[in-house]
Amino acid sequence: MVITLVGEKLAKPGVEFIYYGPAEPCKSCRLARVCTGNLEPGRRYKIIKVRNMEYPCLLHEGKVRVVEVVEPAIDVIIEPRYAVAGSKITLKFVECDDPEKVDLVRPEGLFEGDVVKILEIIGDIECNGRKYKIAKVIRENTQK
């Protein structure tokens, strides 16, 4: 679990977002360390709790709220030989040219080389004439 700040309109439990890095106004903000310093660029986060504290913000239409976030489970296509629920693997993205499957082939929030735990196998999928599995995974170093 990580403490960070998000715009007041976004501050609802269950909301997911991708952190792309600090915006220009953030670089001179006194809250930048709490707001952006705890997040990793390119990662997906899910708000699990909204706290009652709020602060002024130049970027988020006036206010940000203190929230608790986690990296959520993410669906990704993997090789069938690695598809064992409960196992840990080093993520390697499969070769797939189908633009409709890009969100499963290279999902935002995961990077090739991440160590992930396979939570469950969701189903089968085919691409480029090959059969793969869709797995729900979570980055292993987020499991505390």
Swiss-Prot record:
It comes from the Archaea. Belongs to the UPF0179 family. PANTHER family: UPF0179 PROTEIN MJ1627. This is UPF0179 protein PF1381. It comes from Pyrococcus furiosus (strain ATCC 43587 / DSM 3638 / JCM 8422 / Vc1).
